[in-house]
Amino acid sequence: MTAIQNFFKTFFLTELLKGLALTGRYTFQRKVTVQFPEEKTPISPRFRGLHALRRYENGEERCIACKLCEAVCPALAITIESETRADNTRRTTRYDIDLTKCIFCGFCEESCPVDSIVETHILEYHGEKRGDLYFTKDMLLAVGDRYETEIAANKAADAPYR
């Protein structure tokens, strides 16, 4: 009996007609698709995108070379080298993040005691070569300087949940 039913379903194209009816029903309804490059959807305040290093208001970089972010990184994407200055404070001489290894978990941001390393809302970045996704200290500081107002606003919005 089922073989005969299957024959008539396929012979009279009932599945095809059901699919066309469904398509026709949704053709004239409001669209939910976003045309991405031209339209942007709202981003969560907790979105984790491109990394940035922040500075204090006086221009000095925040990183104290505690290396907690390097230790907590599960992907081993962060490399830090530091030196002790004349006033017995440590500062980084090298701070590199390999974004080809990074899984954007946010552990580096959570472990930083001085809020030096942050993940911004920047999601549109690319590289033509693998080396283009290897961010050095100067590149990370440049991102932080450029987007400091946005970073500070996002930190303030997220403050009640931290």
From Swiss-Prot:
[4Fe-4S] cluster 1 binds at C63, C66, C69, C112. Signal peptide: none annotated. Binds 2 [4Fe-4S] clusters per subunit. It is a peripheral membrane protein. Keywords: 4Fe-4S, Cell inner membrane, Cell membrane, Iron, Iron-sulfur, Membrane, Metal-binding, NAD, Quinone, Repeat, Translocase, Ubiquinone. Pfam families: Fer4_7. GO terms for molecular function: 4 iron, 4 sulfur cluster binding; iron ion binding; NADH:ubiquinone reductase (non-electrogenic) activity; quinone binding. Its EC number is 7.1.1.-. GO terms for cellular component: plasma membrane. Residues 54-83, 93-122 form the 4Fe-4S ferredoxin-type domain. Its cofactor is [4Fe-4S] cluster. NDH-1 is composed of 14 different subunits. Subunits NuoA, H, J, K, L, M, N constitute the membrane sector of the complex. Belongs to the complex I 23 kDa subunit family. This is NADH-quinone oxidoreductase subunit I.
